[in-house]
Amino acid sequence: MQKWRYFWLNVVVIRLLTACGPSQAAELSMVTPPATPSEMMDTAAPNPAACPVTQPSASPFVPPPPYSPDAPYQGEFWYGTEVLWTLLSTDGTWRQLPQNKGVYTQKTFWWKKGYDWRTEPTPSLTVTGKRLDGSAPPLEASVATNGYHDDLKSFMLVGVDLPTAGCWEITGHSEGHDLSFVVWIEP
């Protein structure tokens, strides 16, 4: 048990330092054939101002207890509904993402009311994504895993690999419910 606590503490520390490492899951929830060089080319010039990133609303989402009504980290906000929510950057940008084999990697954290990491070690959650400002293969996502930290409570974690920078719509799918957001991936 002690070993698992250290493992999840490391996951949260990495998130705090915004130096998330590459996705470690061996399995992918989406099987995509390797992209050809022409598929990997950006067809649109990067224009972050034209990307409709998801911003905090005037009436922000407040998660149900036992979760804090305030996002656990400065510069981030809760986004979604009780059936599925996530934590997003207030400026809608993912910066300085590590690259692994030519793709940008990020870890996404998700929650849903009643989720317990101890009883659902492999959460019913998949993540998909598509680039909005140019052509690119879809993102690849790891199989969802579970986690717990005092600041975050029970959470679901999915690693994503994005083949290009640019404007991306990312969608979480869980038990018939979908939640989408738009983020700018800084090159």
Which residues fall in each region the model found?
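C-terminal motif of bacterial Sec signal peptides marking the signal peptidase cleavage site
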Residues: 16-19
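Contiguous segments within soluble domain cores/interaction surfaces
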Residues: 28-163, 167-187
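Sec-dependent N-terminal signal peptides
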Residues: 8-14
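Bacterial signal peptide processing site
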Residues: 21-23
